[in-house]
């Protein structure tokens, strides 16, 4: 068995989760068993994995494991049909599609919040005291059973959370205590697990125990995808290899080793080796550690398509991926401004998500300052066929990321025959893109000139599109799987 491990599957997944999921699917398609393993509690986990192209048999979540809920057939729980709400005693009112109120003799005793992206299905139920304070909250699993109950102090902070099997048996409790003035989880208690109770101080300790239990049943190779979980690994007694896949550069912009990797690189965490996306990074990292550093792609493209100018929105630039300060999205705005000096109707679309409201406000201000208000748009985060349509509707992909591990968004665009203009950074574009499409970091004019050339010369665009599609062949499933098998992982 191959265990590809990270924190969660999110509503807005990053390249790490997409890479992990694509590799899971790839391995299984070659009858090489693999699981997408996650640590975090997520009642909608079995819905979000679908956006990653996975099914219930390809995933393993820690909480599912202890809740005896790894394979549960979904039964939709409509709040008006749920047997947990006695209709003879309570009245249900629905002031809006996202919430219903449970009333007893005219007083609201509970609020039922509909599960996001569903119609009237149980999401969570908040129980209220006579002062409208939340005293408890039930979380419902996407598959239709009550998964946990959290109990609250009068100040709104959680005191205790209980987790259930689909049959309603309590199997896990998390106690929250005051630590330096803040209520925090301080004890994870497994109840009657294999006939005994177990206590852990942290979620990571519980995860280590979980993996050891899983490995007793199905020994295998571990590949960890997230540095935030490095300290879960030393206690895992894997009978085979333990590897860390680094999806980014190992250094910051000043060339200094990331502090999160210091113990790993010293060999203090019990890993068998480190895997990176490019041979260039492999060569740079190997002198820094006694661990073997291996190289295999973190990107897999489903199929190659030859794009057509007829499909593109003329002079449209696309920026794809998470919108974050370290990705320098403001550079794309300056480049657009330079492009418009020669191609007045050029437009720019950001496609991705951001959790940084301050950054978005700063970008809005810069858009106004540069006079780009009518030519820049921010599109919704999309996946699958909708993402394909977005890529095929652009004429150029622009990447202003100053540091890369691979550059998944570039490779995905290239597989659709979309030309890419990117900063010439290590461990990404300069390993699979021609020099004429690479520009120095921060050189707005040179990037703009390359884009203008593609916009104004159809023959040049078609040739760039052909080369992009051709180069993306390096990342097809068959090619990538062979490179992974050549690693000879333990």
List each model region and its residues.
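Aromatic "clamp/platform" in nucleotide-sugar-dependent glycosyltransferases that forms part
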Residues: 402
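Nucleotide-activated donor-binding/catalytic signature segment of Leloir-type glycosyltransferases, i.e.
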Residues: 360-381
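Glycosyltransferase donor-sugar binding loop
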Residues: 347-361
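Conserved acidic donor-binding segment of nucleotide-sugar-dependent glycosyltransferases
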Residues: 434-445, 452-459
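Short hydrophobic beta-strand element within catalytic cores of glycosyltransferases
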Residues: 419-422
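Conserved donor-binding/catalytic core segment of Leloir-type glycosyltransferases
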Residues: 308-327, 336
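C-terminal alpha-helical cap of glycosyltransferases
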Residues: 474-490
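A short, well-ordered alpha-helix in the C-terminal region of glycosyltransferases
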Residues: 460-474
């Amino acid at each position: 068995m191959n265990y590809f491990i990270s924190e969660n599957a999110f509503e807005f997944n990053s390249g790490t989760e997409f890479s992990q999921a694509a590799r899971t699917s790839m391995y299984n398609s070659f009858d090489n068993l693999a699981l997408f393993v996650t640590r975090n509690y997520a009642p909608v986990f079995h819905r979000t994995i679908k956006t990653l192209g996975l099914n219930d048999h390809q995933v393993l979540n820690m909480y599912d494991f202890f809740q005896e809920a790894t394979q549960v057939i979904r039964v939709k729980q409509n709040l008006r049909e749920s047997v947990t709400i006695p209709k003879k005693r309570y009245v249900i009112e629905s002031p809006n599609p996202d919430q219903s109120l449970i009333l007893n003799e005219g007083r609201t005793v509970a609020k039922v919040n509909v599960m996001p992206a569903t119609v009237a299905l149980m999401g969570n139920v908040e129980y209220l005291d006579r002062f409208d304070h939340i005293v408890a909250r039930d979380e419902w699993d996407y598959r239709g059973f009550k998964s946990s109950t959290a109990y609250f102090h009068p100040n709104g902070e959680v005191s205790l959370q209980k987790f259930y099997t689909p049959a309603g048996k309590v199997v896990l409790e998390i106690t929250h205590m005051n630590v330096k003035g803040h209520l925090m989880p301080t004890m994870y208690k497994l109840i009657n697990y294999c006939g005994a109770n177990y206590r852990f101080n942290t979620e990571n300790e519980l995860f280590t125990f979980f993996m050891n239990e899983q490995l007793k049943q199905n020994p295998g190779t571990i590949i960890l995808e997230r540095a935030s979980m490095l300290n879960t690994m030393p206690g895992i007694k894997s009978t085979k290899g333990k590897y860390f896949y680094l999806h980014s550069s190992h250094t910051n912009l000043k060339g200094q080793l990331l502090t999160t990797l210091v113990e790993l690189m010293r060999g203090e965490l019990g890993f068998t080796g480190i895997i990176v996306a490019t041979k260039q990074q492999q060569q740079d990292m190997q002198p820094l550690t006694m661990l073997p550093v291996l190289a295999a792609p973190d990107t897999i493209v489903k199929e190659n398509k030859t794009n057509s100018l007829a499909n593109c929105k003329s002079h449209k630039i696309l920026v794809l991926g998470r919108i974050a300060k370290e990705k320098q999205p403001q550079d794309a705005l300056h480049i657009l401004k330079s492009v418009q000096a020669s191609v007045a109707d050029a437009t720019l679309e950001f496609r991705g998500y951001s959790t940084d409201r301050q950054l978005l406000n700063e970008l809005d201000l810069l858009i106004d300052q540069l006079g780009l208000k009518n030519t820049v748009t921010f599109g919704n985060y999309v996946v699958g066929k909708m993402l394909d349509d977005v890529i095929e509707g652009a004429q150029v992909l622009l990447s202003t990321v100053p540091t890369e591990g691979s550059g998944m968004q570039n490779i995905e665009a290239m597989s659709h025959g979309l030309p890419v203009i990117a900063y010439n950074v290590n461990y990404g574009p300069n390993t699979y893109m021609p020099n004429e499409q690479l520009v120095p970091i921060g050189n707005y004019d040179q990037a703009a000139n390359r884009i203008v050339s593609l916009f104004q010369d159809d023959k040049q665009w078609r040739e760039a599109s052909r080369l992009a599609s051709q180069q993306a062949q390096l990342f097809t499933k068959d090619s990538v799987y062979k490179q992974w098998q050549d690693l000879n992982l333990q």
